Every structure is written in structure tokens, then in C-alpha cells.
Amino acid sequence: MKTIYNKYDKNKINALPQVLFPGKIVVVQSESEADKAVDYHLSCDIMGVDTETKPSFKKGHMHKVALLQVSTREVCFLFRLNFIGMPPSVIRLLSNTTVPMIGLSWHDDICSLHRRTDFTPGLFIDIQNIVGRIGIEDLSLQKLYANIFGEKISKRQRLTNWEADVLNEKQKRYAATDAWACINLYQEILRLEAEGDFKLVKVKEKTVEVAAPNDAANDKEESPKDVSSEAALNDKEVSSKDNQLTLQEMLAKAKESLAMAK
């Protein structure tokens, strides 16, 4: 039986083994290549889909989607939209109503894709809309994967240049992993829901208790740190008084000087 949590501790993620897409990655940089890739995907039974956009560090400026990654269990195609735009074959893929396209936070991706061209979204399934069925409240891909599979999806490549002339191997593997992971999550969530083969652990919310002044005085003895703080405060008060006397003396001397001048 699998143990899952309603909320996964993000501090535990770094200690988990990293997962990477194990299959073949194909970069699509022409319309003819896109046509072939779309024909392949529409012959499959499921697709994992995600997008990447070049980060903008200028307020109010946002780049268009640069990459559309579409994965099966074995092969992931990376459509370089910054080179080929949105050809008819890609629109046909995104508008299809026969092969389910699994993603996460699809509303954001579709809005971004619409900035390139208008299309009618097809059979999209958002993991965020179904994960609550098994009691999980987290919505990020990294937390969901860590929770359900006990593996880490690294996000180090997320803010790299997705409009580079050539994507490096780390970028390609990262992009493929995100799309492929959506298939794994979707199928495992459905399996757990159908078989009930899991134990849900509800994590208690961390609360900060604020004690009343009297309670704090009764429950705590004065620590050396408190004593030194009080002493420091007294020293500050004495120093302030000394400064005040010095100022008064200076004013008195100034008045004497004015009187003599007259």
C-alpha cells in the first residue's frame, strides 16, 4: 500500500532521487517535421503536454511560448515554436478531441499558446482538477511527483533561454521530463482512485502560539539573554541622559556667549 500526504513537505524533495525522461527526444524545427510528429501523436492513446517560455526579467514584458513539448511513454517531441510558429499541424494536434492531452495548470498554457494564434482547445485533462479525488491538496508538478512516486523533478533549467539557437541536453531532458511526468501522474492517480491502494496522511498545519504577557512570565524564567538585554537597555537610558546633560551645558554656554556679545 502506498502512503501519500495531503500536503508534501517541500524540504524533503532535495533528498529524493532525481527522475529523468528515459526515452527518445526529437527536436522539431520545420513544418514538415511537425506534420510527421503530429501524425505520430494522433495515432497514440495518450499524450503528456507542457510548454516553456523564455524568462523575462523586465517588468511588464513577456515573451511568447518558445517550446511545446508533447510526449508519449517512449518518445517526446519538442516543437520549437519560436522557429516554426503555429503551423496547421500543431493547431490540429491541440484541437484534437480523440487523444487525451494530459497537463498541469493547462489554463495558463492555453492562454500563452493563444498569444501565438487562436485555436479551439481539444481534449485537455488538467491534473490539478483530479488530484483532489485522492485527498492531495498540492498542485505543483514537483510536489505531486515527489508525493506519489518518491522522486524529484529538478527545476534548475526552468529559467534558462528557451529561444537559444540550440537547446542543450539538460534543457531537452528537462522539457521532456515535465511532459512525460504528466502521463505518469495521471495514470497513477486514476489507479489509486480505482483500487484504493493508498493511505492518506493528513499533515497538521503549523500554528504559531502567542502567549499572553502574564502567561509568558509564569511559564518562562528570565534567561541570561533577557537579563543582558535589560542591562543593555539601562545602559542606553544612562547614555541618553548623559547626552541630554551635555546638550544643556552647550545651550547654557551659547547663552553666555550671546550675553557677552551684547
What are these regions, as identified by a protein language model?
Residues M1-M47, R116, I127, W180, ...:
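N-terminal accessory regions of nucleic-acid-interacting proteins
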Residues P22, V26-Q29, E33, L42-I46, ...:
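Conserved DEDDh/DEDDy metal-dependent 3′-5′ exonuclease domain
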Residues Q187-D197:
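Short helix-capping/linker segments at secondary-structure and domain boundaries
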Residues D215, D219-E221, K225-D226, A231, ...:
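Asp/Glu-rich intrinsically disordered low-complexity tracts
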Residues N168, A175, P224-K225, L247:
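Generic alpha-helix initiation/capping and coil-helix boundary signal
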